[in-house]
Regions:
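Catalytic center-proximal scaffold of phosphoryl-transfer enzymes
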Residues: 1-212
Length: 212
């Protein structure tokens, strides 16, 4: 397994991708999910039905004193992060762009939208929830619950961005797209036994393992 070559791991991002697997003759193929983990801009690993391997690999890296763990709002992402341990070092950050995409789904005026966006961009989650409640913004109950659930993962995005720190999980999303370019070739179907090897080989290539 690749490691960070002596460099401390300061950031990781986790996301899911889809791969089409072969089924018995006469049955339609099925899309199944795999998990992909990107360590900074250096290394990546994707696993199919093997979250334990993903967590073991992350544990083998050289962790910095503080490691930012980025992800979207899906529960599975945070379950894996939590299982990695290192609670005293791991700082979970909700993808700021996904947060704003979810905000955009709430029915409200442009002025209300801007007000809540400003509060959230500054990490003022409690104030944002209060604003939505106080102004009786239509259909905001679900979003308020979403904010409460992820409150500890919503930092001051503006300050992080100004400091040059990541505020989104774009790196792992880019990884998933690069994997898709290989595994979603026109008409491609994979046996479940071969999927792990296909993903590992593709990540090894992207990690530069085959460079001369």
């Amino acid at each position: 397994m690749n490691r960070t070559n002596g460099r401390k791991m300061t950031e990781m991002s986790l996301d899911g991708g889809m791969i089409r697997v072969r089924t018995p003759v006469g049955q339609p193929s099925e899309w199944r999910e795999y998990k992909a983990l990107q360590v900074g801009d250096q290394l990546s690993l994707a696993c199919f039905k093997d979250n334990a391997q993903l967590m073991d690999w992350a544990g083998q890296q050289s962790w910095a004193e503080t490691v930012t763990a980025l992800g979207d709002g899906h529960d599975g992402v945070w379950v894996i992060y939590h299982a990695m341990g290192q609670d005293e070092r791991r700082v979970e950050v909700l993808d700021g762009y996904h947060l704003m995409e979810n905000l955009a789904k709430v029915s409200e005026t442009a002025g209300q939208l801007d007000a809540v966006k400003t509060l959230l961009w500054q990490g003022q989650v409690g104030a944002a929830r209060h604003y939505l409640y106080q102004h009786r913004v239509c259909h905001s109950e679900g979003f308020r619950a979403y904010l409460k659930k992820h409150q500890g993962r919503i930092p001051n995005y503006a300050a992080r961005q100004q400091a040059g720190a990541s505020i989104g999980s774009g790196r792992v999303e880019s990884l998933v797209k690069q994997l898709a370019a290989r595994v979603k070739l026109s008409g491609a179907q994979w046996s479940t036994q071969n999927v792990p090897q296909v993903l590992h080989l593709r990540c090894a290539y992207l990690n530069g393992a085959f460079a001369a």
